[in-house]
Each structure stands twice: as C-alpha cells, then as structure tokens.
Amino acid sequence: ELVLWQGAIMADESEVDISSFLAALDAPPGTATLKVPVVRRSAGVEAANLAAAFIEEGARLLAFVRSRAGAEAVAAQVRDRLSARGSANAGRVGAYRGGYLPEERRALEEAIRTGEVRALATTSALEMGLDISGLDATITVGWPGTRTSLRQQIGRAGRAGAPGTSVLIASDNPLDAYLVRHPEHILGKVEASVIDPSNPWVLAPHVAAAAAEIPIRPSDITYFGMELRGVVGRLVADGYLKRRPAGFFWDATRPERPSDLTDLRGAAGDVQIVDAATGTVIGTIDQASADAHVFPGAIYIHQGRTFHVLSLNSLATPTAPASQGWPRALLPEAGGGTRGSGHPGSREREEAQASSIIIPPARIDDTRVALVEEVRTPLRTRSATHTSVEVCAIEETHVCGDGTVTWHHGPTNVSTRVTDYDLLRLPGLEFIRNIELFLPTHTLPTKSTWFTLTPAALAAMGINAADLAGTLHATEHAMIGILPLVATCDRWDLGGLSTELHDDTGAPTVFIHDAFRGGAGHVLAGFNSARSWVAATLEAVSSCDCESGCPRCVQSPKCGNGNEPLSKQGAITLLAYLLDRAPGGE
C-alpha cells in the first residue's frame, strides 16, 4: 500500500515545497481473509531495497534510522544488495551515528559532501547542525518523532534547480500505523516543545553555566523561576557556586567547565569502547544504554565490524568474565574480523544519591570502559531488564465518576537492572541459551502518570486473573507507543511498568514515566490529555489486523521481558473501559 502526498507544507507562515513528493510506505494490507499470513518486510529492509535502487540510479542520499543498531543494519543490507548485483558502489555506503569518534564522523561528513560516499544510513545525528545539503534523496525509516524532525530530514534533499525526493517508510509500531491512517497529522503545524523548566536536573546545569558568565542575583528569579533559590543553595552546598557580595559565581577552581554539565541531547556521560588488542577507542555509548548493549559477553556492531565485549568496567560493581556461561563450542573466533557483510547497591545509598545530587552523577564518572575484541561469529545477544517503580508523591489525581479507575501524576523512582541475556545465532536468531548477568541497579528519579483499577473494574470488564498481566502489559506498550502523538516526544523518551499488584498502590497499576532525570513534562501532557491519548491508543490497537498482537499494536522493541505476556483483546477491552474514565475530556 503506497500513500503519496504532493504539494506544500507550512513553515513560518510561508509555503515551502516538499521536493518532488513525500511518500509513506505501509506494509501489505490486512490478512484476515487469508489462510496463510502475509509476512511483512520490515521498514529497515524496505529502506535498504529503496536505497540500493536510488544508488544504482546515481543518487546520493541519507537514510534516517531510529537507532544506532538500525543504522548499522541498514548500511550493511544496502552494501549486501549492491554487492550481489556487482555494483562498484557497494564500498561507498556507510553508517553514521553517535558513538563514533570525532575523526570518523568528520571523514564521513566530508565523504558524503564530495560524493565519495553515495549513501549514509544515519541516526538523527545528521538531521541538523551540519552543512550537508543538496542530496538527491532522503529516506526516513519510521516516524522520526516530530514534524520538526521530519522537515529537517526532508530539507537535506534537493537544491536550487534540482528538486529532491523524500520518502517516509512507516515502521511496525502503533504510532506509525496510526499516522498512515491519518496522514493529516504528518503535514500539520510544527509541534510545541515540551519541557519542564522547573526540573532541577535541567535547571541546575544551566544556572551553573549562567553563573560563569555573570553573577546570579535574587532578581534573576524573573528568568529562572521560583525554583532558583533552592537550586542555587544546592549548587553552593555541592561546591559548584561560590557566594560573593555581587552574587553567586561559578567556582573557577573546579576541573570541569560549567558548560560540560549541560547536555542538550539529554545524555549522562559516555562509556568508552576500547579494542583490547590495540588499546584504541573505537566508539562511545551513553551511560544509560551501556549495561543493555555492552554488557560482558555482548556482541557489539561498529561500522559493520563485529566485536565481542570482554568486560564492562564499573566503579560500583565488578563484572563477570565475558565468557562465563558461553558454550565452549560457541565462543567467537577472535582476530581477522572483516568489514561489510552488580549486584544493586543499598536502597539507602540510591535514595541519597537521587535526593542530594542535582548535577547528574554520571557526568562525574567518566571512567567506565567496555573492552572488546573483534571477532567473526554468527552469534548475537539480546539483553533483558528488570524494572521497579516507587511512588514518591502524588501531584495530580483524577477519580472517575464510578470510582473504578483512578489516575495519578507525580514523582517516582524508577529502578532498572539488566539481569540476563539471550545468546542467539544468525541468520534466524535461533535461541541457544540464557545467561545471567550481575550488573548494578540504576535508579532514575523522574515523573510518572499511572492509573489503578479496582476489583469492580475488573469484574465489569470480565478480565480474569489469568489474563490480567497480559492485559496490563499490552495496554502499557500501546499507550507508550501513542503518547508521542499527544506530547512532543519519542517512545524512546518514555518507559513503563505494569503490575497486577503494586506495593505502593495496592492495586493493578500501569505506570508510564519520562525517561529523563527529574521528568520532562511528557507524561504530564499525557495526564492532562488522557482521554485523547486513550482514544488514539484504542483506535491503533483495535484497527490492527493481527490476531494476537504485533509490533504495530501491542509489542514493543524496548520491552525488557521479551513481549511476554501480552493480551491484545484484553488491551482493547481495558482501553475501551478507560476511555470515558480518563481525565482531560471535560
């Protein structure tokens, strides 16, 4: 199914041509009448096929992919397709993403400008901020999260006198499926940004940077808000600011620069990935993702090369040897790799860290290192995560008319730990075995929106105990997938937890939380527009043609439990029940 839009989009009151066309490619139509299900090609496979075709026609292009692993995979698939056709351009395709060294990124940027490289599969890292334009085409693999991002990506194609082509390929997730059915949302007005300026984890680094320019005075509350006094007091207590008669100054004796504390991309420091054979830093990964992607024993892909993670050096917890639990016959062959084809710390310590440190502590600890070795292996790894949520306070409450559903919003502590991983074998990701990990627990103080159900609600819906966990889990996934339609965010900016009986609420509960320290305002926007949020989620799930759940409705690519258990029908029942019992509809 191919849906095309031609014409113009609005930007700053003026019409801007969208190049030749903007296209959204949907997967094959419904299969309900077929005895044999149709296997849908993934958006990444579609993108690789299309990129190879563009390159063979002489085009230069960027393919925007949602994840680092996705960028590597699409680049490898494009090279494979061109190699199979005997194309000389197979070696002129690369990947570009965060985690590459600066010299690698600069070389790739220059190569795509000059035409030495014909195509790059990239994350949003090439979306803006770099002088790369005048390409022939762009491919956007999956909705990029906002109309702003989409227009930035489209703007990379075309130049004076030579219009370009931009293609949007819908991914298998609830939001993309919804947008294909409602294309008017794609070409609407640019969204308003959502940010919580009172969040001390956001405000404190900016106050520190401002104090390095001119002293902070009480009158600056006009600019920084009522939270300024408390934030300044904490910065002084933690040794970042010094009090002088003229105001509060940055402590110039500190080793770091104040600007180092402010990360506009929201990361919290990087883990260096080091080749054990040479001592060379081959890349970096943010602290929040490190445990899930470069744990001891993980298989890590970098520029089409395969690496085996030997260790992840953490100051808090020693790690087990990478080979622990690996079948001896399956240990990877080291050398000659080719291009192309902890135990948790005490609860008291975590709570103390969460409550007393404004500058994210991960910025101070820049010494984590993942040691890797290059290998040739058909093995891949997939980690699993355990999550728990502690309710710290309640700031907003909505009780529905019959009292069977209660919605809340407020601060929570979300604790996660990577617990184990599956060892898989290509090409079909055949399961070999599960291996336990001993990594530390990380606690994120953030904001959540959650709802609870009474026994009367479960009885009214006819949801029994056997189906409850799958119902809540599927509903959580679907609501996370659709929230970006209501709040300016990405599903990767969110997290969630569903439980049949939560310790703090004493009831079946679904939590959706911001994946940012102190919160980002996304789930508050969801709370305030919960009725619209639930309505869109219900439509996305109920209109999906699958029988028992798929990535387009209730499965999640970031699920730490392997998308088990899930009940699509239970989610439809629960969402329909929530629709008239959600806030934001008055």
Where do the protein language model's features map onto the residues?
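Short cysteine clusters
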Residues: C544, G549-C553
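Short, non-ligating residues that shape and space the ligands of small metal-coordination modules
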Residues: C559-G560
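Short Fe-S-cluster ligation motifs
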Residues: L575-E586
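Cys/His-rich metal-chelating microdomains
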Residues: S556
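Extended Lys/Arg-rich polyanion-binding regions
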Residues: P163-S166, D172-K189, H206-A210, I214-P218, ...
